[in-house]
């Protein structure tokens, strides 16, 4: 293989490695915190993919999304590992 072909192959492998997810974290952990439209004030936890931590938020009690955990331990087990 020519040196140009090897460089192209190396570049493609590098791009593939950069775009392939590293963790086995479930997709729900990538969702934003969603309070929902209801007015209850329920203490809940969500995974913040930018800080790589589970954080507290106030859940309204309805709708929202799956990135919503009753305890920080449950959030950590699911999303942090």
Swiss-Prot record:
A GO cellular component annotation in the UniProt record: extracellular space
Pfam families: Kunitz_BPTI (PF00014)
Expression by tissue: Expressed by the venom gland.
UniProt xrefs under InterPro entries: Kunitz_BPTI (IPR002223), Kunitz_BPTI_sf (IPR036880), Prtase_inh_Kunz-CS (IPR020901), TFPI/VKTCI-like (IPR050098)
Cellular compartments annotated: Secreted
Domain of life assignment: Eukaryota
Function in brief: Snake venom serine protease inhibitor.
Protein name per Swiss-Prot or TrEMBL: Protease inhibitor 1
Originating organism: Walterinnesia aegyptia
Top-level taxonomy: Eukaryota, Metazoa, Chordata, Craniata, Vertebrata
